[in-house]
Amino acid sequence: XAPQNXMNGL
């Protein structure tokens, strides 16, 4: 999927 931020790791 799209690249995830380390803080929103869902």
From Swiss-Prot:
Keywords: Antibiotic, Antimicrobial, Fungicide. The keyword Nucleotide-binding does not apply. Optimum pH is 6.5. Retains 70% of its antibacterial activity at pH 8.0 and pH 5.5. GO terms for biological process: defense response to fungus; defense response to Gram-negative bacterium; defense response to Gram-positive bacterium; killing of cells of another organism. The keyword Repressor does not apply. It comes from the Bacteria. Coiled coil: none annotated. Optimum temperature is 35 degrees Celsius. Highly thermostable. Retains 60% of its antibacterial activity after heating to 100 degrees Celsius for 3 hrs. Stable during storage at -10 degrees Celsius and loses no activity during storage for 6 months. Bacteriocin with a broad antibacterial spectrum against various Gram positive, Gram negative food borne and multidrug resistant pathogens, and against some fungal pathogenic strains. Displays bacteriocidal activity against L.monocytogenes ATCC 7644 (MIC=80 ug/ml), and inhibits the growth of M.luteus KIBGE-IB20 (MIC=160 ug/ml), P.aeruginosa ATCC 27,853 (MIC=80 ug/ml), S.aureus KIBGE-IB23 (MIC=160 ug/ml), B.cereus ATCC 11,778 (MIC=80 ug/ml), E.coli ATCC 8739 (MIC=80 ug/ml), E.faecalis ATCC 29,212 (MIC=40 ug/ml), A.terreus KIBGE-IB-35 (MIC=40 ug/ml) and A.flavus KIBGE-IB34 (MIC=20 ug/ml). This is Bacteriocin IB45. It comes from Lactiplantibacillus plantarum (Lactobacillus plantarum).
